[in-house]
């Protein structure tokens, strides 16, 4: 996986709650121009759970087309890590095959939610999906969402036994897990899935981030990651500290509720629309977001 900084993209909706494809393309181009290595369409932040199968595939397609046709400032191409998560292995497998067919660089696959599979079930789920494609696969551990964690031995077994499982997105909140994974397998790439822990995970052996805050501040997230990769940890920490209040504000309610409203307040999307069961943030949250964006001089 030849990327380090990336954003878990929001999926903008029109007022009628259809996907705003033009706005989506614009958001991806902004990521490209502000230095991100990759984008991650239709993950948790992209509200994949409320997209139809057709919409899910179309969002992946737009991301790939936009990255293919838009050069980065260094005249390269931004990579696409396509979200293919589902609580049905067959559906994830179908999405994985589609993503590979149309040119995704890699796929991100979350553990099945609601089903609460055993560790053997998780192993078979990921193994089945990975063996259906040739492109790299990133595991996604977020037990607060899925109800079950990919335990360290299971993650290591997947990495060791399935050749194209190359990385894991760590959103467990446990630095102990990160340390263990890196200790036992230095080549198992670890990406931070917790903005508040980006610097700490990079310092503990991580090689990149998949950021929610990056939707709003891609340039700063990219700078932080690049500093950490160059072992300029003090500079990376300064950027992490600079983003602290923003990271906090963007998670006062369930993601992606705050980030979509923040993007709207910043003038980056026209409609802060959500599909049920997600609803608009509270008045108090909107006020906090406005105050925070003023603090960062994003809005006047």
UniProtKB/Swiss-Prot annotation:
It catalyses: L-aspartate 4-semialdehyde + pyruvate = (2S,4S)-4-hydroxy-2,3,4,5-tetrahydrodipicolinate + H2O + H(+). It comes from Helicobacter pylori (strain ATCC 700392 / 26695). Catalyzes the condensation of (S)-aspartate-beta-semialdehyde [(S)-ASA] and pyruvate to 4-hydroxy-tetrahydrodipicolinate (HTPA). This is 4-hydroxy-tetrahydrodipicolinate synthase. Its EC number is 4.3.3.7. The gene is dapA. Gene3D superfamilies: Aldolase class I. Transmembrane segments: none annotated. The lineage of its organism: Bacteria, Pseudomonadati, Campylobacterota, Epsilonproteobacteria, Campylobacterales. PANTHER family: 4-HYDROXY-2-OXOGLUTARATE ALDOLASE, MITOCHONDRIAL, DIHYDRODIPICOLINATE SYNTHASE. Disulfide bonds: none annotated. Pathway: Amino-acid biosynthesis; L-lysine biosynthesis via DAP pathway; (S)-tetrahydrodipicolinate from L-aspartate: step 3/4. The active site is at residues 140, 169. Belongs to the DapA family. It is found in: Cytoplasm.
């Amino acid at each position: 996986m030849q990327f380090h900084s990336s954003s878990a993209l929001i999926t903008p909706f029109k007022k009628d709650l259809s996907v705003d494809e033009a706005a989506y393309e614009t958001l991806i181009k902004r990521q490209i121009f502000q230095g991100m290595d990759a984008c991650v369409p239709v993950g948790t932040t992209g509200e994949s759970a409320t997209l139809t199968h057709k919409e899910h595939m179309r969002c992946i397609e737009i991301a790939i087309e936009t990255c293919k046709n838009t050069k980065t400032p260094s005249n390269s191409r931004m990579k696409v890590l396509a979200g293919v998560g589902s609580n049905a292995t067959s559906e994830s497998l179908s999405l994985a095959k589609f993503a590979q067919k149309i040119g995704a660089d890699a796929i991100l696959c979350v553990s099945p939610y609601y089903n609460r599979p055993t560790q053997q079930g998780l192993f078979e789920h990921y193994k089945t999906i990975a063996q259906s494609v040739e492109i790299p696969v990133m595991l996604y551990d977020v037990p607060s969402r899925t109800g079950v964690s990919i335990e360290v031995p299971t993650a290591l077994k997947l990495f060791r036994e399935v050749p194209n499982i190359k990385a894991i997105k760590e959103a467990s909140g446990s630095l102990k897990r990160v340390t263990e994974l890196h200790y036992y397998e230095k080549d198992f790439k670890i990406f931070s899935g917790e903005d508040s822990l980006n610097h700490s995970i990079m310092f503990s052996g991580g090689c990149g981030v998949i950021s929610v805050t990056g939707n709003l501040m891609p340039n700063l997230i990219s700078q932080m990651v690049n500093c950490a990769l160059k072992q300029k940890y003090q500079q990376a920490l300064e950027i992490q500290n600079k983003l602290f209040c923003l990271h906090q504000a963007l998670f006062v309610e369930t993601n992606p509720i705050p980030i979509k409203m923040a993007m709207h307040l910043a003038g980056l999307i026209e409609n802060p629309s959500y599909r049920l069961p997600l609803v608009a943030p509270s008045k108090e949250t909107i006020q906090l977001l406005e105050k925070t964006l003023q603090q960062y001089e994003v809005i006047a």
